[in-house]
Amino acid sequence: MAAAVGVRGRYELPPCSGPGWLLSLSALLSVAARGAFATTHWVVTEDGKIQQQVDSPMNLKHPHDLVILMRQEATVNYLKELEKQLVAQKIHIEENEDRDTGLEQRHNKEDPDCIKAKVPLGDLDLYDGTYITLESKDISPEDYIDTESPVPPDPEQPDCTKILELPYSIHAFQHLRGVQERVNLSAPLLPKEDPIFTYLSKRLGRSIDDIGHLIHEGLQKNTSSWVLYNMASFYWRIKNEPYQVVECAMRALHFSSRHNKDIALVNLANVLHRAHFSADAAVVVHAALDDSDFFTSYYTLGNIYAMLGEYNHSVLCYDHALQARPGFEQAIKRKHAVLCQQKLEQKLEAQHRSLQRTLNELKEYQKQHDHYLRQQEILEKHKLIQEEQILRNIIHETQMAKEAQLGNHQICRLVNQQHSLHCQWDQPVRYHRGDIFENVDYVQFGEDSSTSSMMSVNFDVQSNQSDINDSVKSSPVAHSILWIWGRDSDAYRDKQHILWPKRADCTESYPRVPVGGELPTYFLPPENKGLRIHELSSDDYSTEEEAQTPDCSITDFRKSHTLSYLVKELEVRMDLKAKMPDDHARKILLSRINNYTIPEEEIGSFLFHAINKPNAPIWLILNEAGLYWRAVGNSTFAIACLQRALNLAPLQYQDVPLVNLANLLIHYGLHLDATKLLLQALAINSSEPLTFLSLGNAYLALKNISGALEAFRQALKLTTKCPECENSLKLIRCMQFYPFLYNITSSVCSGTVVEESNGSDEMENSDETKMSEEILALVDEFQQAWPLEGFGGALEMKGRRLDLQGIRVLKKGPQDGVARSSCYGDCRSEDDEATEWITFQVKRVKKPKGDHKKTPGKKVETGQIENGHRYQANLEITGPKVASPGPQGKKRDYQRLGWPSPDECLKLRWVELTAIVSTWLAVSSKNIDITEHIDFATPIQQPAMEPLCNGNLPTSMHTLDHLHGVSNRASLHYTGESQLTEVLQNLGKDQYPQQSLEQIGTRIAKVLEKNQTSWVLSSMAALYWRVKGQGKKAIDCLRQALHYAPHQMKDVPLISLANILHNAKLWNDAVIVATMAVEIAPHFAVNHFTLGNVYVAMEEFEKALVWYESTLKLQPEFVPAKNRIQTIQCHLMLKKGRRSP
């Protein structure tokens, strides 16, 4: 338990009354009114350590407001109780949740009726054919047809509709829907074991076609014989023609007597039942029961009711059938199967009710949780933002370190109006000029009167006292940057709103990250290199001449092969043809001649004569001409001038035209081309702030916020004079200090910065606290603010620990630009010589008691240039930065390759490389709408079907039968890819609801049956069989798709085939197929990723890295590729003991 001390955030005071209560309240008011910058919430840990709580709800924006403080406490207590309720509610839900996923399997194994039935009801044929024989009515078929009559070679069929035109008959059940729609009745195939096949032929000893002809002749002679019409019904049932069966049965019903109607009724009921008009069939069989009590009618009705789900009626009918024929095995088995299914459905309904109840409880829990989050927002509204808390704590830690390390960790007090320093022991005491000890005259050690006068070391006698006092009164933060572009921080004393802008200033000046057209352009002057152009005067040319413009084409042009490739494409770019004057360039141009009133035509004449009569290196004049044409807005002439300046400039000065040409491209929106030029300029000279600022602007326009911030940071580090840079300083500082104002977050794991879109729901909440890079930059600046002081401490933030350490240096001389040091007491020289201050350290250490998991990668904005990693943010300042030794032998430094270090590898969560990752290239990537090929709207009324492709498709040049896996597909060891189930079920999800696997398979089968040449449908069928785990059937469909697909579409079935071969461990075949897919469509990231997966399975890790990296080039935010790259790199270093790939 942690007890609150100091300004108590929890108010864990014992109950008291009277004066004690008043005293506590007055003490609280007195402390709350101070408004100090230190932490306002401290706790005592279990080991007795007093520890500050950085991320505490009691650290308020307005710590002096007692009412808010008390409300905050009430909200904290309420949230604690609400959290307990939520936890209890969640436990209750989890304890009562029905998680019985094996209910059906266990029921089928344990239920007595299921055991007797042996098979589930769904596996029984409930369309089992039945009929009543003519012999049961004492009628012999031979009496109605001439069995001895010869049959012609082309026998006739007994078409009852041609024999007799039947009028409306009350006996023919024409009111039933199935009878009315008899023309459209479906005809599922009859099983070969159906007894109807052998009834007539076995009885009459003739073939069914001969019998049909004899029935036709009999009906020609006697058109009113109900016996012949029933025989015709039997004939058409054998032929599986439901329409003809109904027509003949209707005529049999019309002419037969009441006691003989059951024969035709059972025939009619069988046809209607098989055509899925089971309710109509039940009506017909009930009519048959009115005329007879035959076993067949009850058995047929039992099957019909079982199909309709009327299980009680079905069991009753089976019981009647067994009374008529005891021991009939089919009736016994079906009766128990129906009872088994009935009890299973009852159990499933009970489980559904339980799950529905759990769902309602979860909805209620979600409401409570939302309420909890709203209360949490109220709590956060008054809490100090995390960055400010960290900043205040760093200041506090630093101040505490100052007081504690004045002399061997002894604490000294300023007394006598800060003119004397009182210390406990006679030990060396060090202080720093220009700090709070400036006015100290003597130091007193212990309780005696021994004092020591001031002994100044390296003291600058001519230091301005008023300046020092001003610096004492100002915030120490203002001195955290010693030099900015050749000017010390005192030069910015009247520009604090730029150097240290407030959040409100940034919100007003830059409410969002500027887009490309809002960013300034720059001009890198040659004066930065110590080069100057001789100023033109009117003596050099006649002012009466006609105005001229600079023509760079008249200069000699020598081709520079080293840099020509960077600008060779610019001459033909259509987007550079438009005239777009650059106001920034115009202001720069006018400022360079120090005359804002001179017309542009006169400037053009200046440059025209300068080019014709150069009085300086010609490339310098061409560089100025490029600026002129930028201001005018003629990109063609500007490129011509700058290209010639680039080719004529000495190598060490080529960054000047490169930077200026890049700014021209930035003005025209060609930011990616501009980054290439700027990176080349940095390779020539990395000491120009304008180059980094230009690169930062290009990265901003490309939404590469990480690269932009790092480029700006590099620009701030330079001490080169740059007056032109100061206009961009406020934007840079706003983005550094208030990243969350611009929706910029920084990833702890990857070191890259992401710009989030407002309202995006793709970013997931991380379990770990994400600390802004800019806070760490502030920490680094505090090291510069007090360069001769050391401190140590720790900040706790939501399971993160930020350790602060300072290491002492005293032997730096005045050339370092830091304050001189002075000493009181026994100051031994060897102590100073032996001690040294080195780099300030910031390390983040995970708390051992927290088990925080890494957040999966998000969409990350990565650099688009190969060496862009030079400008990736580094979150861990590990100092001192010592140059690593050079390469020894053939070993290379993997960190220079951008690989993670061994320590980082141990912290990373590795991907299981042996796991098979299934990929699928959707036909929508080819601009194909799947709903135009598959009907998702029409309800399915027929039994489930499966999409079958032609397994005997002849070999062609497209079917890849030369591959072992394709030619021997029947013997593949293929385990299936059930992870693609959701992909299959979500086909057409944008327009229609999700459907079951069986429904999707049936829909594909229906359209594929009509169109076997559609490569789209064949690919869908292959996806179905991949989910089902049937490798042979899947490859049959893929062969069919490859045979009929156009060349540019073949990568869709090829990717599926590569996955099947990968799953079957036929990796060489898989590589061939995936490579073909990449060659057809190299612009699809999934094709590259699939090929990388195959190489991983082959343990060809170097090749896999190449394809994963090309995947990221096509889709930079593809997280699985990033994770696999990191895992492979760590595997190569740690598992194989290698430091380089």
UniProtKB/Swiss-Prot annotation:
SMART domains: TPR
Subcellular location, record wording: Cytoplasm; Cell membrane; Cytoplasm, Cytoskeleton
Gene3D superfamilies according to UniProt: Tetratricopeptide repeat domain
Keyword NAD included in the entry's annotation: no
Coiled coil: 340-382
UniProt keywords, alphabetically: Cell membrane, Cilium biogenesis/degradation, Coiled coil, Cytoplasm, Cytoskeleton, Membrane, Repeat, TPR repeat
Biological process annotations from GO: actin filament polymerization; cilium organization
SUPFAM superfamilies from the UniProt entry: TPR-like
Tissue expression pattern: Expressed in germ cells as well as in somatic cells of the testis (at protein level).
Presence of keyword tRNA-binding: no
Gene Ontology CC terms, in alphabetical order: actin cytoskeleton; cytoplasm; cytosol; plasma membrane
PROSITE patterns assigned to the protein according to its UniProt record, in alphabetical order: TPR, TPR_REGION
TPR repeat residues: 295-328, 619-652, 689-722, 1014-1048, 1051-1084, 1085-1118
Family listed: Belongs to the TTC17 family.
Free-text function comment from the UniProt entry: Plays a role in primary ciliogenesis by modulating actin polymerization.
Subunit structure as annotated in this protein's UniProt entry: Interacts with CATIP.
Protein's UniProt name: Tetratricopeptide repeat protein 17
Species in which this protein is naturally found: Homo sapiens
